[in-house]
Structure formats: structure tokens, C-alpha cells
Amino acid sequence: MGFRRLTCPHLALEGPALTTALVGIGMAFAAPPMPNPNLEDTLLAGSIEGMERDDLRVLAILMTWLGVHAAWINVDRLTTLVGQQSSLRVRAFWGAAAHWLDKDRRFARLSKNYGGPRLDLLATGTDFHLRRAGEDPRFAGGPLRVPAGILRDRKGDVLTPTELARIHGAYRRRILLGPSYRADMWAELDQDPSLSAAELARHTHTADGLLDYLIGANDWC
């Protein structure tokens, strides 16, 4: 069966919409949560905010979130999204994250999205901070140079998996079914069983031809 996946959101979230989406996937910012934002869209938008707009707080909490929740990311989709980015800094960030998460073999392909020299997270002062405090061990040996202490790592800045599963339907379904398009489809159907195939494909960034393959005519639960 031939099919294609609609992996790319129309526009990356930014501003207040991004903040509410980040809260919606379990990050501690002062904003109301967006209901069930797409995980990969939100993670990519957060990395753009951090790397292109130098928002170190977003980047710090994003890294903490990855340390807690990486197992439930659809890495196939994230890899494709990152590969579509023209920003070398965004690609380098995800290459660094994949290097850190290399015990999960799904991240191997993501690490290949950046093949350039090591970049500095900070615009200035990297060498000084490295001499003073050393390197953040999460980034050691990866494509991004980050001095220790620049990106704080506080587990209290993100919800636990149990807490996030209570408020995010797709995350909960991914825990049950695995981090896949199929889990996201079922999460959408949990919210609205009347969705047409076209609507379901659009909501989950999945082309119509994949629906029968993943769900099946009698695969209802």
C-alpha cells in the first residue's frame, strides 16, 4: 500500500500560543495550557524559540522535558520536521539532544540531521564559561557547546509522566499503544468519534491512505 505522511505543521507556534502549548505538554510556564497540543510540533517550536531567539529558559525546560519524556516522542516525525528546518542552530540542537539520548536507538537518525562543526549556544563568552564551570555533561561530545549551569535542570519544571497522561490524551494513548501516529489517531477519536477520515488525517498529520492500514475496519476499542 502506498501512503504519505503530512509531517509539517503550516507555521511554527510562537509568542503566547507557543507558551500555552508548552504548558499543555507539561512545562511550567505562567500561562493556561493549550488542550492536547501536538508533541512534536510543540517541541520543534520550543527549540526554534530557544536557538533562534535565544530564549534560554525555554531551552532549559525543553531539555529537562526531554530527559523525562523522550520515550514517548514520535521520533520518526520529529526527525522529519527537524530535517525540514533551514536553521543550522536548530538542527545542531536536535543533533545534540539525539547524541545525549543515544541509548534510545530511535534517535540515531535524528543525530544525522546536522553534520557541521560544533556551535556555541551562547553568542559570546562560551570559552570563559567553559574554563570557569566546564561543559554541561548532557552536551559533551555533541554538536553544541553549552557551559555547565547555563541551562538549569530542575525536574520540578515539568510534569511527571503520570501527571501529563492525566491531562494530555495523545500522550496517554502513546503510553498505552506506543509513540506512533496510530496512538495519536486514537486520541483524536477519543475526543470526537465522529471525525471523518480526512479530518482525522489532518489532525494527526497523517495522509488518508494510512488510516485503514493503522486502524483497520474492525480495530475499535
Segments (PLM) and residue ranges:
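Short helix-coil-helix linker/hinge
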Residues: 175-183, 194
